[in-house]
A protein has these predicted regions:
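Eukaryotic scaffold repeat domains enriched in small/polar residues
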Residues: 24-258
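Bacterial N-terminal signal peptides
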Residues: 9-19
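Bacterial N-terminal signal peptides that target proteins for export
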Residues: 1-11
């Protein structure tokens, strides 16, 4: 995941920083002053920290969920979990200890994550088609897990890219609305589907919007998606270096640029 268009809560951004950069302090103008805690995340059994796809705060407000790619080697970029037995979905307590992990063998390139109000964890696999071995039924899908790792739902057709209602092409991210509706950023590649796909809480297709381009409502590489407390849908449009804002029916309301 690129950090050029972060559509994340402040807490999740702080987790990224604490995992990836040296210790330093930052003065704040608000009462919520904070300091970076170097080495906060403690991976078990000597595991090396791979790339962090995304992090989210648990509904309890204390724990942090993160997608951490399995292999820390730079030469594996794009397929870090292809042949790994490591879990890419990890839950950390406030002290940075892993208290839950799962997802081994289910992803090739886990990318986005969200946690719904019931504590279920949603994870996307944004692997590109040329990184999926022949016959492998992973990639181009989104998995809903219980908080203990039980697979509850799969959206998309694993291992098969496409642009229909039951297919994605390298879905980058997922966001769950307060009513349970599911919004998928589809997807990671600039020349891919470039759309937002919406499902209800049962996984039934409702609608999609977008298309490849630079006009309002069009995208070039959707890289992140989030929903604010007012229900607005924020989409990180990476190749255009902008954030587009929509209502939940796909109506464009604003664009933020760098």
């Amino acid at each position: 995941m690129s950090f050029r268009n972060p559509i994340l809560s402040l807490a999740a951004v702080l987790v990224f920083v604490s995992l990836l950069v040296p210790q330093q302090s930052a003065a704040q103008n608000s009462t919520n002053a904070y300091m970076i805690d170097e080495g906060w995340a403690k991976l078990p059994n000597g595991r090396m920290m791979g790339a962090v796809g995304k992090a989210k705060v648990d509904p309890d407000g204390r724990h942090i969920w993160a997608v951490i790619r399995c292999d820390a080697g730079q030469d594996r970029f794009g397929s870090e979990c292809l042949d790994s037995d490591l879990d890419p979905v990890l839950k950390f307590d406030p002290d940075g200890n892993v208290v839950e992990s799962f997802g081994s063998g289910l992803f090739i390139w886990p990318h986005g994550i969200d946690v719904d109000s019931d504590g279920n964890v949603w994870v996307t696999d944004a692997v590109s088609d040329n990184n999926i071995p022949a016959g492998d039924d992973r990639g181009h899908h989104v998995i809903k897990f219980s908080s203990t790792g039980e697979v509850l739902m799969i959206l998309g057709t694993p291992g098969e890219q496409g642009d229909g209602p039951n297919n994605f092409t390298s879905p980058s991210d997922v966001a769950i609305a307060s009513n349970g509706d599911v919004f998928i950023a589809d997807g990671h590649n600039a020349n891919g589907n470039n759309r937002v796909v919406k499902y209800n809480s049962r996984g039934e297709y409702l609608m999609s919007w977008g298309g490849t381009g630079y006009a309002p409502g069009e995208f070039r590489a959707l890289h992140a998606i989030a929903i604010d407390p007012d229900g607005r849908v924020f989409v990180g449009d990476r190749s255009k270096s902008r954030i587009q804002i929509f209502d939940q029916e796909g109506n464009h309301s604003a664009t933020w640029t760098q």
